[in-house]
Amino acid sequence: MKAIAINGSPRKGGNTEHLLKQVLAPLTAAGWDTEFVQVGGKHIEGCKACYHCFDTKDARCGQKQDGFNDCMEKMVAADAIILGTPTYFTDVSAEMKALLDHSGLVSVANGGLFRGKIGAAVVAVRRGGGTHAFDTINHMFLMSGVIVPGSTYWNPGFGREKGEVDKDDEAARNMADLGQTIAWLGEAIHNHANRRAAACVRE
């Protein structure tokens, strides 16, 4: 199975990246194909509501912005999508917001490309505002039919300077548990789908 972690922070090697990789580690250990994708720092224009995606239905955005369509292709191919963002004025980064708006609309325009996938939000925060950023990501997931698993708590990690989040032991435990939960849930969904397919063949 495939899991993709998308980093919405423009600061490479920063706290958001650290958290995302903590989630991916148990998935890799469970035999999943995992991939880390850097979106923060790339030029992704905001959605212009041109609805070109409803006309073409090719799972792509008609705007030729850098990086989005490649990222969308990876999201569609994944069984689990983990989106990470720093907290900017109590919300997600500009790149993450553009990704959410584009991908959510393209998914809907193409009949629900994200429906039935697993999705998780991960947030790096210095002090406050992380809950709102967490909600912003989950709003897109829940409106797209994505299955959002819980963990030991919500999914923030606290820190400002690069690597500071590694001192947040509770966050580390939570991210590890989140990765393990995604692995378990993915296997359960996969097994259920196989049983349904086998039943259809017998019928």
What residue ranges belong to the model's regions?
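Glycine-rich phosphate/pyrophosphate-binding loop and the adjoining helix
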Residues: 1, 29-30, 70, 147-203
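Helix-loop-strand module that forms the ligand-binding subsite of alpha/beta enzymes
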Residues: 62-147, 153
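Cysteine-cluster motifs in flexible loop/terminal segments that predominantly coordinate metals
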Residues: 42-75
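N-terminal beta1-alpha1 ligand-phosphate binding loop
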Residues: 2-32
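Short, hinge-like loop/turn segments at secondary-structure boundaries
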Residues: 51-55, 101, 167-168
